Amino acid sequence: VQAAASTLVLLSSMINAWHTGQWDITQLTYPISCLLLTAAIGMKLGLVPFHFWFPEVLQGSSLTTALLLSTMMKFPPITILFMTSHSLNPMLLTSMAIASTALGGWMGLNQTQVRKILAFSSISHLGWMAIIIIYSPKLTLLTFYLYSLMTSTVFLSLNTIKVMKLSTMMT
C-alpha cells in the first residue's frame, strides 16, 4: 500500500511536469495531478477508502511497533499534506475526511481488541485533520502534534500494563 502510494506521488508529479513544465510537488496545478496526489496522501495516511490495511497491520504488530506506525510514520505524509494543501482536490479530500471521521468512530465501537480500537481512532482523528487542513493548515499540525502526544501516552501505558483486549483491562 505504501509503495503504491509513493508511486502515485511520483506519477502525479510527472503528469504535472508533462503538462505544465513544473516538477515541484508543492506547485501542482494540473487537475489530474492534484487528484492523484490527494489519493496518494489518503493512502499513506490510511484515510477511507484506503484504510483497510491499517487496523490489520496494527493488530498484527506489537504495541511499540503500532505506536510507531500510528505516530512517527504519519509525520512524512502529514508534512506532504501540509505543504501541498493548496494543491489538493478539495472535494475528494473532504469526502475522504468525512468518511474517515464517521467510519473510524463507528467501526471502533464494534471492536474488543485494543490495537484495532486505536487504529480506528487514528483513522477518525486523521479524518478530522484532513477536514481542518482545508481551513487552517497550521491548526492541522497542532492537532497532529497533540494527537501524537496523546496516542504515545496511551500506547506506552497499555504496553506497561500489558493490555491486549478490553476484557483484560477491567481485571
Language-model segments: what does each one mean?
Residues 1-171:
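Core, highly hydrophobic multi-pass alpha-helical transmembrane subunits of bioenergetic inner membranes
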